[in-house]
Swiss-Prot record:
Keywords: Cell cycle, Cell division, Septation. The keyword Lipoprotein does not apply. It holds the Pfam family MinC_N_1. This is Probable septum site-determining protein MinC. It comes from Clostridium perfringens (strain 13 / Type A). Belongs to the MinC family. Cell division inhibitor that blocks the formation of polar Z ring septums. Rapidly oscillates between the poles of the cell to destabilize FtsZ filaments that have formed before they mature into polar Z rings. Prevents FtsZ polymerization. InterPro entries: CAP/MinC_C, MinC, MinC_C_sf, MinC_N_1, Septum_form_inhib_MinC_C. The gene is minC. HAMAP family: MinC.
């Protein structure tokens, strides 16, 4: 099940943790959940500035100090900034954020693994035996023949798209599918996404997808 209590996304300073304090029993429960969520991408967040967006009436100065100390020690962030979560921002818990995006201008070859805590756009191919993992969307401007894991942090809105979608395996938010033995190349770009907990693949339609 998707955890909508804390949402992590990129921003111009580094990373932004949007926290819905209404869904936590107390501060310590929230802190444990935040540390657990950030720990999954610790190597990406090291040295980053973290902006914590939440309803500040739930957190006092002592707790703010504790949160900073824990995150400095365990996640190795560089700085921590707090900002008030406005009412209009509540929509983030049901909406989709693109977050930060990385462009990779190379082919992912057999035995290589590409991992990123955001969206990945690969200008090249993903060969058989190659592996790509991303917290967000994975877009391959070429042939996708290896393994791709999108929404690797539980993002059920992530998609996988490629000019030619012939994967060994694709996964979105932990849901996995493999190409059938009688798979036939379509000759047009396709998009894989989740629909009612199942991965479906459909032709790419520019008017339908506006990521």
């Amino acid at each position: 099940m998707r955890d909508d209590r804390i949402f992590i996304k990129g921003n111009k300073l580094g990373i932004n943790a949007i926290i819905n304090m209404d869904k936590f029993g107390n501060f310590d429960e929230m802190l444990d959940s935040l540390v657990e969520k950030l720990s999954r991408g610790k190597k990406f967040y090291k040295g980053a500035t973290l902006t914590v967006t939440t309803d500040l009436k739930y957190i006092n100065e002592r707790q703010i100090s504790k949160l900073k100390d824990v995150l400095f020690d365990e996640i190795l962030i560089k700085d921590c900034i707090f900002e008030e979560r406005l009412e209009k921002q509540s929509s983030v818990f049901s909406g989709v954020y693109e977050g930060r995006t990385k462009f990779v201008r190379k082919t992912v070859r057999s035995g290589q693994c590409l991992n990123y805590a955001g969206n990945l756009i690969i200008i090249g191919d993903v060969n058989n035996g190659g592996e790509v993992r991303a917290h967000g969307n994975v877009i391959v401007l070429g042939d996708l023949k290896g393994k791709v894991f999108a929404g690797d942090n539980g993002n059920e809105n992530a998609i996988i798209a490629a000019y030619s979608l012939e994967p060994e395996l694709i996964s979105i938010s932990g849901k996995i599918t493999i190409s059938p033995d009688d798979f036939e190349k379509t000759g047009y770009p396709e998009v894989a996404r989740l629909n009612e907990n199942n991965i479906i693949v459909e032709p790419y339609l520019p008017d339908k997808y506006s990521y």
